[in-house]
Amino acid sequence: MPSIFWTGKLSPTTKLMANFSNAIAWITGNARDSAAMKERVKKGYEGAVTDDVKRYDEFGLHHFTRISKALLEGIDLQGKAVLDVGCGTGILSLLALEQGCAHAVCGDLSEYMLGQCREKANALGYGPDRIDFRMLDAESLPFESNSFDAVISGMVLGFIPNQKSTVVEMVRLLRPGGVLAVSTHGPELYYEAIEVSFRSVPKHIVLGYRIEYWPRKEKDINRMFSEAGLIDVRTRQLTWKDSFENGNSAYEFFASTSAMWWCTKFSPDKIRLVSQKIRTAFERKPVKQITTDIILAYGRKPS
């Protein structure tokens, strides 16, 4: 079941406002409708809110490559069969292939993002003997148990309502001795951008809406992995700040990499209003730094 309250960093006033809205969302059922939540995230990454998502790699490639390299430093994928849950444009999957994995299955909820991954793989000359593509839901993965040597996932878990059961599902697919490696959203990820966005959106539009986002502390992810039956569990936190020339550049990074999925809850006219208010707020403040806060987590399925 999704968490009711906001789990990331916000200023005290903004967090109070967010949690008041979340409580209403729980009572009305919005915060318990996992299927609708996942559908909104999917629509966001298919461009329902902003065309900026089409510039995902333009603004986010360096950022997500840094995260992906940090994640894969902790495991050996040489000759392994790998599943990438929530592959996006394929940054993590293609890096795994570059580092010697035998075969990668790239899975994502968004048809658009999966298509981008396929195009990049084809351009690099990877055929079906090395890579495959599947539309999938991370909470119900369409594979037999014990199918993969490694399951990897980059910056996806924070968008999933039922995180504990998702980790259990990933572990189910591992062969004995297989490795799960995940990067996910820490409490301060994009803090400055989220704070400005929350404050700039008209409150009557978002009241009673629980945004589909659940960042976690390092100890929470460690516990999830251990409770899912993994051994040799280890985690580490990775943080830095990205700097931008001006507020508009910061907004373009945030809009393209987040796809502003939460706005899919709104009608088209309100989407335009909210998007413009957020952009204007970024420019006026101006937002010139955005925090990256990542949890890297690893665990092994007992042999």
Label each PLM-derived region with a short phrase:
Residues 150-162:
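A short SAM/SAH-binding and catalytic strip from SAM-dependent methyltransferases
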Residues 83-85, 89-140:
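Class I SAM-dependent methyltransferase SAM/SAH-binding core
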Residues 4-77, 91-95, 113-116, 125, 181-203:
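Conserved class I S-adenosyl-L-methionine
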Residues 139-150:
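A short acidic, Gly/Pro-enriched loop at the edge of an enzyme's catalytic core
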Residues 5-8, 14-31, 60-62, 89, ...:
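Conserved Class I S-adenosyl-L-methionine
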Residues 164-179:
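A short glycine-rich, Lys/Arg-flanked "PGG" loop and its adjoining helix->strand segment in the class I
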Residues 107, 154-157, 183:
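Residues lining the SAM
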